[in-house]
Amino acid sequence: DTECVCTKELHRVCGSDGVTYDNECLATCHGASVAHDHACEGHEEHHVDEHGEDHD
């Protein structure tokens, strides 16, 4: 596992995996591409923060 270094910038994006990430860097670090800006809709309500913690 390589550690990703991302800023704490809050610019939520919806990942291709249906997870809301706090920013594009975090989505990329988790192997997801950005589906669109803003939180995901129509999926379980959870997101991954800069610590890699999943919040539901």
Curated annotation (Swiss-Prot):
Site location (Reactive bond): 8-9
Cystine pairings recorded for this chain: 4-29, 6-25, 14-40
Gene3D superfamilies hit by this protein: 3.30.60.30
Presence of keyword Disulfide bond: yes
Database matches in SUPFAM superfamilies: Kazal-type serine protease inhibitors
Residue span, Kazal-like domain: 1-42
SMART domains (UniProt xref): KAZAL
Domain of life where this protein originates: Eukaryota
GO molecular function: serine-type endopeptidase inhibitor activity
InterPro entries: Kazal_dom, Kazal_dom_sf
Keyword check for Disulfide bond: yes
Signal peptide boundaries: none
Pfam families: Kazal_1 (PF00050)
Keywords associated with the record: Disulfide bond, Protease inhibitor, Serine protease inhibitor
Function description: Proteinase inhibitor. Blocks the activity of trypsin, plasmin and sperm acrosin.
Protein name as it appears in the record: Bdellin B-3
Species of provenance: Hirudo medicinalis
